[in-house]
Amino acid sequence: MTQLPSFSERLLSWFDEYGRTSLPWQQDKTPYRVWVSEIMLQQTQVSTVIPYYTRFMSVYPSVTDLAEAPLDDVLSLWTGLGYYARARNMHRAAQMVVSDFDGEFPSSVEVLETLPGIGRSTAGAIVTLGHGGWAPIL
């Protein structure tokens, strides 16, 4: 009797054939880069995010650079992406990562969720994609 591939095997096979692997935030993955992409992608199409992400990373290549930037500069760079609360929360969260965690993103979902604008799915992405850990991503 032939056994059918499991759901996870079929899903991974589908990803190998059709999954996106060349997006800017998929290169040189760090917790910071994963976090920025996850926040930008909330309620925003990938094609819209790509140029914003590229510009944002060129101006703020590290969480420290973002934390030290004036909020007005961050909001100006965000112009056109919408949902400005995301940028405000990112700026405040960056300041907290620098001041409370020595510039290193926590590797715990529970701790990440204490930062402004980071919910369960974003925290899971940071842990899994940025730190190489295991956490659910919705």
Locate each region found by the language model.
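Catalytic cores of DNA base-excision repair glycosylases
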Residues: Q3-L138
